[in-house]
Amino acid sequence: MAADSDDGAVPAPAASDGGVSKSTTSGEELVVQVPVVDVQSNNFREMWPSLLLAIKTANFVAVDTELSGLGDRKSLLNQCSEERYKAVCHAARTRSILSLGLACFKRQPDKGEHSYLAQVFNLTLLCMEEYVIEPKSVQFLIQHGFNFNQQYAQGIPYHKGNDKGDESQSQSVRTLFLELIRARRPLVLHNGLIDLVFLYQNFYAHLPESLGTFTADLCEMFPAGIYDTKYAAEFHARFVASYLEYAFRKCERENGKQRAAGSPHLTLEFCNYPSSMRDHIDYRCCLPPATHRPHPTSICDNFSAYGWCPLGPQCPQSHDIDLIIDTDEAAAEDKRRRRRRREKRKMALLNLPGTQTSGEAKDGPPKKQVCGDSLKAEETEQEVAEDETRNLPHSKQGNKNDLEMGIKAARPEIADTATSEVPGSQASPNPVPGDGLHRAGFDAFMTGYVMAYVEVSQGPQPCSSGPWLPECHNKVYLSGKAVPLTVAKSQFSRSSKAHNQKMKLAWGSS
């Protein structure tokens, strides 16, 4: 899949039927490899035209970051959105972005209603100013294959805050971010508040002091809209869990079911890169779910709920995402069966002689319900409530909600899945999707895939001049809160001075 061509020709698309799963004629599943282009200082100029072309021709761009830390975790979960914003701002001013992932998705209407060409890039960065790097972040990134020696030797240099002179014509990460703004494409992130704040401070300008000014700036920077796949997975797709790897794998599986049923489904193509680029391509495997999955150990409850476990690869319980989803789906089906049985019993009681479905006789006053009927109704309502609670934003987690916000630097989103690599651990020896290296590029791809699948699952969209996927438009997930952050410019907020200067740089003095 997406193998290198030997003639050095222009990269050609390589198809992946059904998303990131492809079947042979014999029905055997193939492991599909997602090519992630590594971009560093030694090939940044060479890759510059490809980066610009991918961004400018994309229908939407997904972004992910790896950070050097975040600071005080409690402040990042402050129930006051303004105080939470200030805490993230402090982190962005004192920490840095270590790597940037870009996944550009371009529609191919001639190849199907939901066909995309996906181009994925992983940029290794090096902030040229002093910044804090946290030990936990280092441990996590090293555990997932991040090469700090390579980062310091080959990281693309950049500076934070406001521009230093005219940088609009230089080939830099800051100019690349400006080109992303100029492209006016929808921006897709996962649990995106932290990413947005860090992107602004590191590649754009000094952050404004107030959240209202920040969202006003964002509204003008990305007029096509900002989309958060964590919000989409939790509030619209209603997944049991919404951390990135869970959402991605769940969408993969559902997309495979739709493909098998002949229903509308997502298909992807990747570029067939020439052999001259071989040293700069990292192929990430996406495995089909096993038909008969062994159950060697119990599932880690912490990882199942949050996508993160404090024991990491030393955990004796399973972190297998497919096994977690299998268990969730089995539990949901069991609840549906029990609910149907209770509904049948309820109807049988209502149809007994002397009872009325409306609780009211034809020629007399209302009669009391049969005692058993009342109990059955209460049980049914309770079960429905349990189902709804399970699909709400992890109410049982309390103030711990996700830990994602507080540990995004050592991302819990897909943390510590490589359990089979630790000698002596009792985890499943079978590899799972996303195993091994933890890359901002592949995370960006997973983020974009989830958004593309959400579009498929919502069915045909009415032709209008309105925004793409209006239910998710400009809504950014806030951990621990029941409502998202709305990216909008209110009548009480003004854009920041630094932002206005950047807009003049992007669009000219007008």
Swiss-Prot record:
Gene3D superfamilies: 6.10.250.3220, Ribonuclease H-like superfamily/Ribonuclease H
PANTHER family on file: POLY A -SPECIFIC RIBONUCLEASE/TARGET OF EGR1, MEMBER 1 (PTHR15092), TARGET OF EGR1 PROTEIN 1 (PTHR15092:SF37)
Organism: Pongo abelii
Highest taxon in the source lineage: Eukaryota
C3H1-type zinc-finger residues: 294-322
Keywords carried by this UniProt record: Acetylation, Metal-binding, Nucleus, Phosphoprotein, Zinc, Zinc-finger
Protein name (Swiss-Prot/TrEMBL): Target of EGR1 protein 1
Main localisation: nucleus
An individual GO BP term: snRNA 3'-end processing
Family stated for the protein in its record: Belongs to the CAF1 family.
A GO MF term: zinc ion binding
Chain segments carrying region Disordered: 1-23, 332-400, 491-510
